[in-house]
């Protein structure tokens, strides 16, 4: 047996959908406005996980042009039946006010790392859609229903809807019905159905994806219900226990092992500040499940609080260090890199124009929801060093390039090169804290007219230092900040909702429209070990 420390996937890895195929385990997670859509991890031991697939990698599968911050791909459902992998996902177009526009789609593939199909449209009545394969060969879709009538008292969550899916016709068929209205916790979402023994089990998330989050279990002898709430409700929550290291526990999925054990994957948040801000976003954890004599799933060890240490049946040693050094020697972007909303095209970047460099052609501003030129790496550690080397020769103040600690279009900290008509090349900082924009260095720092500039972000928990160097030796600090505002929780403090996580991006802007290029010679990221654990 091996002791595994939670979370098993650090940084932004929310809404885990966990399955087993023979001896292989897979977890699919939400990606929101980041492209490619959905990330799928593989493990042979439940201990160490490797990113193996980013299935929604074509515009024909996923076009998120213009989607709001924290829109896009919500809560994918990964499943497997008769040699085929199925992936259901939402592409959320709007999320504010009473209404949410949430078209749901299905793609398939015979290999987890293969080319997934173009999507089949399913419905748009709500989000968190999940496909269930019953033992009789029929397939069913469940999703929460968005009820935009406030006088109904549902807070927008109208219950879990069930409808049959026809593989032959590639559409939903038959009548729709609400099979579960939820418990008193409310905000019933994230459904997954399982047929285990004599019962259908419905797993849902409740309480909202914050500090009151929870996992609810109900069961029925018939698929259509009625569903009875577990006497051990909720299965999992950290609500009311702010002393726990794992907060926001909820949105779970279940699988068994080949030796008969059961596990649940769920999301969590780890607050590190007095304001209870989770700077790494919502992460993925694992809990062992045991079944009662009368057939209810419960946490091993009793109670319903998430454990930060669990046992798994393996002799593998957990790997928790994160270090990457990209030198841009290939002709494609590194597999781990992401872009915003849509893929970069050959008009946006090149890895061949100058071998050994990533050339980014200036695009729209960091506030754009349409066509930014940015590629980013997820922050996976509370403390880290990230740096790059940049060659950039702007001739207009509207041309900028650099390294950005990015949450979304109105929440980022940007260290960049630009140009001033009186001083030539300059280094500056743009701080966009929840729409409050400022230039802390005012006019910036003069730079030599030619040559490379090394840029570095160093973060220790919530404390960030931006610095630069001309030789990659002695770095000169230019700005320090409390960057805990790059979090879901900072939005909650002002009455708004976000669901993603911080990234470190390389980017280039040219709002003259001339698409002036910037050349990046490398990207380096290393988690600092004293806070990784």
What is each PLM-predicted segment?
Residues 1-533:
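Carbohydrate-active catalytic/glycan-binding domains of CAZyme proteins
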């Amino acid at each position: 047996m091996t002791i595994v420390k939670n979370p098993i996937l650090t940084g932004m890895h929310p809404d885990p959908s966990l399955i087993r195929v023979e001896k292989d385990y897979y977890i699919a997670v939400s990606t929101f406005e980041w492209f490619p859509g959905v990330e799928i991890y593989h493990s042979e031991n439940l201990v160490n996980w490797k990113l193996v697939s980013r299935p929604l990698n074509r515009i024909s599968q996923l076009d998120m042009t213009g989607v709001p911050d924290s829109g896009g791909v919500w809560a994918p459902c990964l499943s497997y039946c008769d040699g085929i992998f199925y992936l259901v996902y939402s592409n959320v177009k709007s999320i504010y006010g009473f209404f949410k526009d949430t078209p749901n789609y299905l793609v398939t593939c015979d290999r987890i790392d293969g080319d997934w199909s173009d999507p089949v449209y399913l419905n748009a009545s709500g989000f968190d859609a999940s496909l269930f394969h019953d033992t009789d060969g029929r397939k069913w879709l469940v999703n929460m229903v968005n009820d935009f009538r406030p006088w109904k008292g549902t807070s927008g969550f109208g219950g879990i809807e069930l409808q049959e899916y026809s593989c032959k016709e590639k559409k939903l068929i038959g009548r729709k019905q609400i099979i579960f209205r939820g418990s008193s916790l409310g905000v019933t979402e994230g459904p997954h159905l399982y047929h285990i023994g004599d019962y259908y089990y419905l797993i849902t998330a409740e309480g909202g994806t914050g500090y009151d989050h929870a996992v609810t279990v109900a069961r029925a002898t018939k698929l259509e219900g009625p569903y009875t709430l577990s006497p051990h409700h909720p299965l999992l929550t950290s609500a009311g226990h702010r002393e726990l290291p794992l907060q926001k526990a909820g949105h779970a999925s279940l699988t068994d092992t080949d030796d008969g054990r059961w596990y649940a994957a769920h999301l969590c948040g780890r607050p590190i500040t007095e304001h209870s801000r989770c700077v790494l976003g919502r992460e993925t954890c694992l809990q062992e499940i045991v079944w009662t004599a009368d057939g209810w799933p419960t946490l091993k060890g009793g109670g319903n609080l998430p454990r930060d240490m669990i046992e798994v049946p393996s002799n593998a040693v957990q790997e928790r260090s994160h270090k990457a050094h990209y030198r841009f020697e290939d002709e494609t972007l590194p597999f781990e890199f992401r872009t915003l909303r849509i893929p970069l095209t050959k008009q946006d970047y090149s890895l061949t124009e100058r071998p050994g460099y990533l050339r980014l052609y200036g695009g729209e501003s960091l506030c754009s929801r349409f066509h930014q030129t940015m590629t980013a790496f997820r922050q996976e550690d509370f403390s880290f060093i990230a740096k790059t080397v940049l060659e950039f020769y702007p001739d207009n103040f509207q041309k900028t390039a650099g390294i950005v600690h990015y949450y979304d279009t109105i929440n980022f900290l940007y260290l960049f090169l630009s140009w001033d008509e009186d001083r030539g090349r300059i280094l500056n900082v743009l701080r966009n804290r929840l729409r409050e924009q400022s230039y802390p260095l005012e006019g910036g720092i003069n730079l030599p007219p030619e040559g490379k500039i090394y840029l570095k972000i160093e973060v220790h928990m919530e404390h960030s230092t931006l610095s630069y160097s001309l030789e990659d030796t002695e770095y000169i600090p230019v700005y320090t900040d409390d960057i805990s505002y790059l979090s879901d929780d900072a939005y909650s403090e002002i009455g708004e909702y976000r669901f993603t996580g911080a990234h470190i991006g390389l980017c280039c802007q040219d709002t003259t429209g001339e698409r002036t290029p910037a050349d990046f010679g490398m990207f380096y990221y290393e988690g600092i070990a004293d806070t990784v654990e």
